[in-house]
């Protein structure tokens, strides 16, 4: 009995470690909205079902075929300690961009998870029989191996409770919004650029109005409800709501909650193609925002985006088109001048013969689109051109989104939070306009569904045809398409460096640098990379 109790204690430690990881992945995959968590399990089946857990299959076979109960207990304890050791060391090597947030929902899931795991243990302790040890360990071993699937089960079991909690917060948010009759809502959606556009529009409108925006990447129903219930106040003139989605109908759900009067679509691309299913569904979903606006509302659309130009809008609200290449729009930017300090450009409005000069600290065409959205909406809301010019000049770069920083004497163009094809292309444009030696550090693009190989290979071709002198690829398997794209375009193989650990990129960058060097940090690089920059950077 003593050995069994010890094995239970060690088992509970193992379950805690593995369950925390499973809950983290469930949270990252939006609690299985659009079956994202199920798809993650399938994609990572080696971690979720195989790998070192296979050792337990050996143990289970051994325990069934022997009657050596004490030895079975010792084997079970040793295997648990070994798996805990492997698990902890594996996690140390990984650095999550977003750590597990211990929200109320996660705590409720943890409670259900604890109950589910304690029930069989309590039954075993009450009905303890040494002859049944093999059966006990068989049950516990299977529960450990299937932990990610058990997490899926507890998410399902908690669904009625979460629906009740959601309805409570929703009603509270709706009542608060209905009481704020002097405040209008601005919705922002798109395949990418939502957070950057939200920040830019906020900074521009804030020069005249009291504007509140959703914090960080709060772009789900719960995120908006929390923002409304805990942060909005009666003095806000405008509330900017970032709207994210991974399946059709989710933008409409957000619009039904906050009733936006104004809407901005950034760009429509391949982000979350895996969960949407098709590019057409992505297009229709993003336009749920524009089609939810009232007849006296205003939509701001990108005239350089074919997906937006080709869509048949089912709404008679006012539409303002912005662009850079398309000069038939209502508001376009021209004469872009890029330096390491930022961008200068001119803006032309339809019906106005003058070109108006603007200056910003932001880099890249994507950021000019974001600024144009803010300028166009700000002008409609009565902000003078002089104030718009001042506001644009004051806009601060968003960290990890084409922001400039330093690592010793290396100039870093930090685009580590970008993960889309158009953004990658524009980031390379920014790099190519800088003086000195150029490097790219990237682990490649993810969450672009079945086109992941294709878009990463194209990214490799684009790097090869840019002014990039050295390429550092992080991860052998994920970056293989980029490597193939580089080689296909006859990029020198000696200039391609493939690393398994992102931390090895730092000494390599220092080794490869020249007197003046610019390094583009592109795509979903882990937080460890950003932490290394912050701790080591010298000014």
Description of each model-found segment:
Residues 201, 205, 224-228, 371-381, ...:
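Buried hydrophobic packing segments
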Residues 154-172:
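N-terminal pre-Walker A segment at the start of P-loop NTPase domains
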Residues 265-412, 436, 461-464, 468-470, ...:
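Acidic, Mg2+-coordinating active-site environments of NTP-dependent enzymes
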Residues 1-138, 142-159, 376-385, 390-539:
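ATP-dependent carboxylate-amine ligase
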Residues 207-234:
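Conserved substrate/cofactor phosphate-moiety recognition/catalytic segment
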Residues 220-221, 225, 247-253:
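Membrane-embedded segments
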Residues 171-217:
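Walker A (P-loop) phosphate-binding motif
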